[in-house]
Amino acid sequence: LMLPADVAKKAATPPVSALTVNPAPADSACLQAFREAAEKRLSTSKRTALLADFLVLRHGLRTALQTWVKEVPMAHATMLMGKGIFDERQSGFYGTYSGSASAAPVKEAIEGADTVLCIGTRFTDTLTAGFTHQLTPDQTIEVQPHASRVGDVWFTGIPMREAIETLTALCKTYVRDTRAPLDHSGFSFPTIEGALTQESFWRTLQTFIRPGDIILADQGTSAFGAIDLRLPADVNFIVQPLWGSIGYTLAAAFGAQTACPNRRVIVLTGDGAAQLTIQELGSMLRDKQRPIILVLNNEGYTVERAIHGPEQRYNDIALWNWTQIPQALSLAPQAECWRVSEAEALAEVLDKVAHHERLSLIEVMLPKADIPPLLSALTKALEARNNA
C-alpha cells in the first residue's frame, strides 16, 4: 500500500462518537423461516445445551449470551477461544469443550444434549482435538455473524444479534433444564506445597485471578493449561489457537495495556514463545506499563516435544537468564523480577504483585516433559489420526 507522504498532514475531522458498523436489518422472510425451523426443533428437544465461541466476543454480544443463560438456565460451555464469555463460577457452566479431549462432564453435557445451540463457533483442529467433536447437523442449531442454520438448512441475511434474540425468546418457552445445577460456590484449592508442576502452577494461579483482569495465554502449554481456569465475571481471555502463532501474547499484551492502562494485564507465555517477540518488553518498559508476565520455563518447545520429537535438538532453545532481561531492554527499567520453582514461593510472589506499581516478570520453573491434561489428550488424538 503506497500513499503520498503528505496524506498524514492533511486536516481531518475527528469522529464525535465511537466508530461502529451497524449490520443491515435482517431479511424478514428468512428470519421468520429461521424462527419456525428453530421452534420446531426446540419444542421437541428434551435436553438443550449452549456452546459459545469467540465470534460472540468479536461481535460484542457477550452481555446478550450472559443474559440468555441467566434467564434460561441450561448447561452451557465455551470453546477455548470463547473463554471469558460467561462467569465460569456460576451454576450451569460446565467448562471448555474440546472434542474428545474434553473433561467428561463437559463432553456429556454438550454431546449428550438433544439440541446444541452453537453460537459463533469454529470447529478447527486445535480447538477440537483433531476434529474429534461428536456433534451432528441434525443435533445443532448454529448461529454465525450473518447466517444461521437449523439441521441442514441455512438461513442467510440474519445478523447474529437478531438470531440470538430469536433463540432466547424461544428458549424461554421450550427449554426446561432438569439437570441438577453445578455448584461452583466453593470452588477453591487447598494450599499447595512442593516443587512446581503444571498441576500445582495452575491451581496456584487460580486463586490470583480476579474480575476485570485481561489474561493473555500463548499457544502451547500456556493456553492448554489455562483451559481449566475458572474465570470470574468480566475477564477478557485472549488466546489464538486458530492460527497458533507463538510469541503473540507479548505484543498483544502491549496493545491491551495501551488500550486499558488501568486494568490488570496478566501474560502467560512459554520461554520458547517469549524469545520470538521479547523486544516488546522494551516497548512496555519505555511506556512505563505494568503487566504481570509469567514465563513458563520448561527448557524449550514442550508442546512440540509432546507432538513430535521429544528428544530432538530442534525442540531445544538457548537458555536465558530471564530475570535479567529487563536490564538489557531498558536503560532505566521499572521492573521487578523473580524466579520461582516452589508452589509456596509462587503464591508469595503473586501476593506481592497483586497490587503492583511496575512491570512484574516471574520466571516459573517447570519440569521439561510435564504437560497439561488437555495437551496430552490432544497429542494422543493427533497421533491416532496420523497413524490411522
Q: For the regions a protein language model found, what residue spans apply to each?
A:
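Glycine-rich phosphate/diphosphate-binding loops that line cofactor/substrate pockets in enzymes
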Residues: F34-T48, W68, I110-A113, T204-P211, ...
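A glycine-rich helix N-cap at a beta->alpha junction
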Residues: L285-E304
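Glycine-rich ThDP/TPP pyrophosphate-binding loop and its adjacent helix/strand module
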Residues: P23-E39, T44, T323, A332-S360, ...
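Terminal amphipathic helices with adjacent charged low-complexity linkers/tails
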Residues: M2-C30, Q139-T178
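Active-site diphosphate/adenylate-binding microenvironment
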Residues: P181-N262
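Glycine/aspartate-rich loop-and-adjacent alpha/beta segment that forms the canonical ThDP
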Residues: P4-L31, L127, D351-A388
